[in-house]
């Protein structure tokens, strides 16, 4: 349940960031977004932090939720011991794949290269930035203090199970 909450939180940030970029630039091709971090810095910083959260880099909540999944897998009993390592290996592979498709967007956004002309600043409106910022801060804060979320979810899960 923790991973579902974490995943939805950071995916919301990423979708909001993508929506803001599409709305302000009209661009949907990643190659056309070189230098977008200079044009839309707040949006792209949120997108970058959301990307780190989805990959599972500390101090984002994604790290904590993946850590908990890995520990749960390693603590399993009643199965062949090599199967306990299957969960952490899959988590690591998925993190590498996620980094492979998100980090090029972030890196090209902030480091477009010398030959790219960066246009004027065109940051999203406050009605788009505020929710994105709140969720971004929440993902980092809950990553640093995960007990705030686990203490909230534990009674709910106990009642359901």
Question: What does each model-identified segment do?
Answer:
Residues 1, 66-75, 154-161:
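Membrane-interface interhelical loops and short amphipathic "cap" helices
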Residues 12-77, 81-95, 120-138:
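Interfacial and helix-entry/exit segments of alpha-helical transmembrane bundles
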Residues 1-8:
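Short alpha-helical catalytic segment bearing the HExxH-like zincin motif
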Residues 7, 33, 62, 106, ...:
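Divalent metal-coordination and catalytic microenvironments
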Residues 9-14, 157-161:
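Alpha-helical transmembrane segments and their membrane-interface exit regions
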Residues 37-44, 95, 99-161:
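Cytoplasmic/organellar membrane-interface segments at the starts of transmembrane helices
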